[in-house]
Amino acid sequence: MLMEIAELGFLAAELSHGVRYSLIPGILKAVEGGVLRISSVHNFCPVPLGVSRPSPNCYLFSDPHPEMRRVAVRHTLETLEFAARVHAPAVVLHLGHGGPDGITPRLERAYHAGKLYARSSTRLKVAAVAQRRRDFPQIYGRVRECLDALVPAATQRGIRLGFEIREDYAEFPDEIEMDRLLDDYGPAVAGYWHDFGHAARKEFLGWHDHAATFARRVAQGRLLGCHIHDCSPPDHDHRAVGDGEIDFARLVPLIPPEAIRVLELSPRVGRDDVIKSKAIWSSFAATSA
């Protein structure tokens, strides 16, 4: 797997939440042999034993049950240990669920029906934001309990935690909640992880201005890394670069040179489109240099 990635011209790769324990010996051999570097590891990695299919949300830091939060922390500690073994500088985290359930599918249906900006959709969004503000102290208390248990282990290993922007408003954090997280966890410990497709999906549903959000995080000096893929409205993400509607030519010049860049395409994207995506992205980066 890593050899094939290297043959495509990549110098580093992210290990995703789809890596199973059976793959670890081969990965360690490839890394130790200098096949390529590991840029980052996505929680949970390797896939926790007993989990039937890869899922970064199989355990949640926001879970109302303390025992399940402890399980989430335990498996994240395993991810941190694995990240240290492959010399990865960052671990990307999903932080949990904030609610309300089902809001994104409802808004996507409204989008397709041409009713995204109808009063009914606006009322739905206002109610969702009000619920999140009301529930924030409780949800954030749970998430912070977990993060506080992880920070010492990450710091000891020289690993920074990446707080990923999510595509579904029901997931935690939203953009305002992200501000609080970044205030409470400084740049030596954690950073913002920008996912271009996720941010685009939120923009398509009217939650924020993608470019403004990205520019603000960069200006704050908090961009740790990014997942790169294109997106067509309202929810067709993980497409090859150039096949969607994201204005990469506008956004790429904002990326600082130290930020981690990961091409995160759907498994359905073919080899030729992977090569094309790499070439297009590289051309934007060269223009911005």
What annotation goes with each model-predicted range?
Residues 47-54, 100-103, 235:
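Short acidic/His/Gly/Ser-rich catalytic and metal-binding motifs that mark active-site loops
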Residues 20, 46, 98, 169, ...:
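Positions that flank functional sites
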Residues 56, 121-127, 227-232:
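Short, basic/glycine-rich phosphate-binding loops at helix/coil junctions
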Residues 61-191:
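Active-site acidic/histidine proton-transfer and metal-coordination neighborhood
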Residues 1-88, 110-120, 140, 148, ...:
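N-terminal pre-domain/capping segments
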Residues 12, 40, 162-164, 193-194, ...:
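Generic enzyme active-site microenvironment
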